[in-house]
Structures are given as structure tokens and as C-alpha cells.
């Protein structure tokens, strides 16, 4: 048997603060997932040459859990003559957890509460990503262009464990810096030229 649920949502807000083009924007999104499955594993294998039996009697529980969310904020400041300065920041986090725990019966009570470490395996992965950017945008009658710079810190962690025993725990931190260039030219209503570069 098993059960689970999956939920997600998104909230957006944007407000123009004056007639010149000052704009504040904000968004928040996220989701969560949680499910489980129960399984019975019973087998009795007889090895004739070795004259022995191998009995496997287990109740296995599978759990899969995850969540994620992202927050974003943007500020656009008009500089005059159809020129704008934009600052943005985003923060996102994601975590995934997959558990497989096998239990054998207690010899005294018969309840399946003894963890079988040979058949159990659990892992958890976590990710955090950020981006801060500052850009200049110019709008003209036939064309517009944007020149900016991004800073992208990120963090990841991967854990492998059985019960309370940690088998491996690896983490990594990285910071990337990248330029950004965008150029759009409108020849007519049907024809546009677009150039975009996001360096890494």
C-alpha cells in the first residue's frame, strides 16, 4: 500500500511607483511532495549443493520527500532619456530525500522493527542557488540593449546514510561571475534581430 500528496503555489507582485518607469517586482513560488509505499519481501531459497536454506522475511518502507521554493525581487530605476538601471536578486532552495528501510521481525515480539542494514539505503540531496545582478538598459525607437553583470553563489550537499549511520556526506560551494549582453533590433513589424550573451 502507499499514499502521497503534491502541492505547489506561486505569488507575484509588481507595482509601478512613478510615471517615469520606477518599478518594484516580487515573486515567491514553491512546492512540496511527500509519498510512501509499503512492501513485503518474503522468500525461502534452498541451496542443494551447500545443503542450506536462505530465508528473507522483510517489510520494506519507501519514502520520497521533496520541497522547493524560490524568491525573486527586482527594482527598476529610470535614469532619463529612456535609460534604466535594474537590480535583481533571487534565492532558491531544493531538497530531495529518498528512503528505503527494510525491517525484519523481532524474535521476541514478532514485530517488524529490526532494521536490516544490508537491504536499506537512504540519501538526501540539498541545493541552494542565488543570483544578484545589476544591469543598464537603453531603449531606442529601433533597438534596445542591456549590459549587466551577474554573481551566482551556489551550495550543494549530498548525504548517504542508513539509520543513524552516515556513510558519506559531501558538500560543495561555488561562486560564478558572468557578464550579460542583450541586443534587439527591429527592422519592421515582421523582422527582428536578437543577440544574447550570458557568460560563464
PLM region spans:
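Primarily recognizes Gram-negative and organellar outer-membrane beta-barrels
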Residues: 1-200
Amino acid at each position: 500500500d502507499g499514499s502521497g500528496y503534491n502541492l505547489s503555489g506561486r505569488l507575484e507582485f509588481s507595482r509601478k511607483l512613478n510615471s517615469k518607469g520606477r518599478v518594484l517586482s516580487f515573486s515567491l513560488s514553491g512546492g512540496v511532495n511527500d509519498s510512501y509505499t509499503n512492501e513485503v519481501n518474503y522468500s525461502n531459497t534452498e541451496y542443494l549443493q551447500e545443503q542450506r536454506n536462505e530465508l528473507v522475511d522483510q517489510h520494506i518502507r519507501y519514502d520520497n520527500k521533496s520541497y522547493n521554493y524560490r524568491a525573486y525581487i527586482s527594482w527598476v530605476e529610470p535614469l532619463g532619456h529612456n535609460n534604466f538601471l535594474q537590480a535583481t536578486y533571487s534565492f532558491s532552495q531544493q531538497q530531495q530525500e529518498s528512503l528505503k528501510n527494510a525491517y525484519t521481525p523481532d524474535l521476541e515480539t514478532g514485530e517488524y522493527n529490526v532494521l536490516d542494514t544490508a537491504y536499506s539505503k537512504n540519501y538526501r540531496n540539498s541545493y541552494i542557488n542565488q543570483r544578484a545582478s545589476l544591469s543598464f538598459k537603453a531603449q531606442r525607437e529601433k533597438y534596445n540593449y542591456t549590459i549587466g553583470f551577474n554573481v551566482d553563489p551556489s551550495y550543494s550537499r549530498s548525504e548517504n546514510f542508513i539509520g543513524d549511520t552516515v556513510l558519506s556526506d559531501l558538500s560543495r560551494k561555488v561562486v560564478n561571475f558572468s557578464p550579460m549582453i542583450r541586443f534587439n533590433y527591429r527592422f519592421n513589424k515582421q523582422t527582428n534581430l536578437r543577440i544574447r550573451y550570458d557568460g560563464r
